[in-house]
Amino acid sequence: MSRMAEQQLYIHGGYTSATSGRTFETINPANGNVLATVQAAGREDVDRAVKSAQQGQKIWAAMTAMERSRILRRAVDILRERNDELAKLETLDTGKAYSETSTVDIVTGADVLEYYAGLIPALEGSQIPLRETSFVYTRREPLGVVAGIGAWNYPIQIALWKSAPALAAGNAMIFKPSEVTPLTALKLAEIYSEAGLPDGVFNVLPGVGAETGQYLTEHPGIAKVSFTGGVASGKKVMANSAASSLKEVTMELGGKSPLIVFDDADLDLAADIAMMANFFSSGQVCTNGTRVFVPAKCKAAFEQKILARVERIRAGDVFDPQTNFGPLVSFPHRDNVLRYIAKGKEEGARVLCGGDVLKGDGFDNGAWVAPTVFTDCSDDMTIVREEIFGPVMSLLTYESEDEVIRRANDTDYGLAAGIVTADLNRAHRVIHQLEAGICWINTWGESPAEMPVGGYKHSGIGRENGVMTLQSYTQVKSIQVEMAKFQSIF
C-alpha cells in the first residue's frame, strides 16, 4: 500500500489542521513501512475540541431518546457496510491478521454500539413517595463533555466501547487514540458524522499521550475520563483528573491473569483455552491468561498438547486468510517483549518453544516475535510477576486447590481469571474466591456487549459494557415536590 495522505484532527464534523505544528508517523509493524504522517493535537486544539463538544452536546442532549437511538443505529449499519475496508486499515496499523480484524474488531465494536443504541429509551428516573403531599423524583442527566483515551491493541473497538455508552447517555466525547494506532478512530468520526451525529459530539485528537492526553485530563471543561492502558499511565490520568476538577474516571488497566487447569479437566480443552488466552492477537490482550497453573502430575502431558498446538500457529502475510498470528504492534514494543524473554531465560525458566524473533522471508523487516512458552516457572520470576503483553506463556505447577487459589491471587493485578474443570461445584467454589473482575469457566476471552468488564485491585476502576456503564455516564438529579403549604419555623 502506498503512503496515505497526512492525517489531520477531526473537530466539529470535519478535518482540521493541528495548531501545534507537530506530527508523528504511524508504522505498519508487519514490514516497517510508514503508513502516514499524523498531526498531533496541542493545548489549543484541545481547547477548540472542548468548545466544539460543548456546543454539540447541547444539541445532542436536546434530541429525543428515539432520535439519538436512530442516529447511532445508522452508524452501526455504516460500520457493518464498511467492515472489510476498516478491517484492512486496522490490520495495516496494528499488524493483526486480517482474519482477526475482519471478524472481531469492527464486528464487536458495532455490537456494543447497537446494544447501547437500544438502551437509550430505557434511561429512566424514579419516583419516591414521601407522604401524602410530597414525593421525590429523579432524573438521569448527561455529564456533558467526556474524554476517552484509547490503547493501541484494539483501536476502533476501544473507541466504540467508550463512545457508545457516552453518546447514548447524551454526552459528547473527545477521543484520543493511541499514537501507535491512530487511523481507524478518525474513520469512526467520519462514520458518526455520516450517520447524522451533530457536529462536535465526537471529536478525535491524535497526539502523544504525555501531551494531548494530559491536556484532556487537566481540562476543566471535561467531566469524565475513560482510559485504557497501563497501570502507571492510569495512575497519572487519575491523579490529573482529580487534581484539576474532580473528574469521574473509568480505568481499564493491565493484568497478569491466572488460568487454572484442574486434574479432572479435559486436557485438550484446557490446552485449546490456554492457547487462545495467550496467543490470540499475538498475546496483545489485556485479559490474557499468561499464568497457566497445571497440576504437577499433568505437566508433561499438558506441555506436549501445547507444543502440538503451537505447531498450528500460522504467521506470515497478514492478509492471507490462513494467517492467525501477526507481528507485535511496534518495534519498541517488540524489543520490550524480547527483554522479558531474555529475563525469563536468565532467571531459570525453561524455554519450551520460541524465545526469539521470527526469522526468514517476510519476517526480517517486521516486529515479529515467535510464540514463546516457558515452563519450570516459579511465582517470583519477572515473567510471572509483570505484564508482558506479548506472545509469552508461563507454565506453573501446583499440588492442591487451596495452594493454587492463594498463588493465583498473589498479584497486584485483578483483571481476569479462568478455570478449566469438569466439576461445576468446584468451578463456582473456586471462581468465587479469585480476585478478578472478569472470570471464565471452561472458556476464555469473550466480552459481549451485555457483560460488564473491568478489574479489581490495580487493574482498574469502574466497568465497560453492560447497563451499569450507561448509567455511569449520567448524573442523578433528585427533585422534591411539596403540594401542601410550606411551613417555616421563622
Curated annotation (Swiss-Prot):
The EC number(s) this enzyme carries: 1.2.1.8
Chain sites annotated for binding K(+) 1: T26, I27, D93, V180
Residues given in the record as NAD(+) binding sites: G150, A151, W152, K176, P177, S178, E179, G230, V231, A232, S233, G254, C286, E387
Sites of Cysteine sulfenic acid (-SOH) modification: C286
Gene Ontology terms for molecular function: betaine-aldehyde dehydrogenase (NAD+) activity; metal ion binding
Binding site residues for K(+) 2: L246, K457, G460
Reaction(s) this enzyme catalyzes, per UniProt: betaine aldehyde + NAD(+) + H2O = glycine betaine + NADH + 2 H(+)
Chain coiled-coil ranges: none
Biological pathway: Amine and polyamine biosynthesis; betaine biosynthesis via choline pathway; betaine from betaine aldehyde: step 1/1
EC category name: oxidoreductase
Keywords: Metal-binding, NAD, NADP, Oxidation, Oxidoreductase, Potassium
Cofactor binding note: Binds 2 potassium ions per subunit.
Site (Seems to be a necessary countercharge to the potassium cations): residue numbering on this chain: E248
Catalytic residues in the record: K162 (charge relay system), E252 (proton acceptor), C286 (nucleophile), E464 (charge relay system)
Cofactors required: K(+)
InterPro entries per the UniProt record, alphabetical: Ald_DH/histidinol_DH, Ald_DH_C, Ald_DH_CS_CYS, Ald_DH_CS_GLU, Ald_DH_N, Aldehyde_DH_dom, BADH
Keyword Metal-binding annotated: yes
GO process annotations (BP): glycine betaine biosynthetic process from choline
Protein family membership: Belongs to the aldehyde dehydrogenase family.
Function: Involved in the biosynthesis of the osmoprotectant glycine betaine. Catalyzes the irreversible oxidation of betaine aldehyde to the corresponding acid.
Assembly: Dimer of dimers.
Protein name: Betaine aldehyde dehydrogenase
Taxonomic source organism: Escherichia coli (strain 55989 / EAEC)
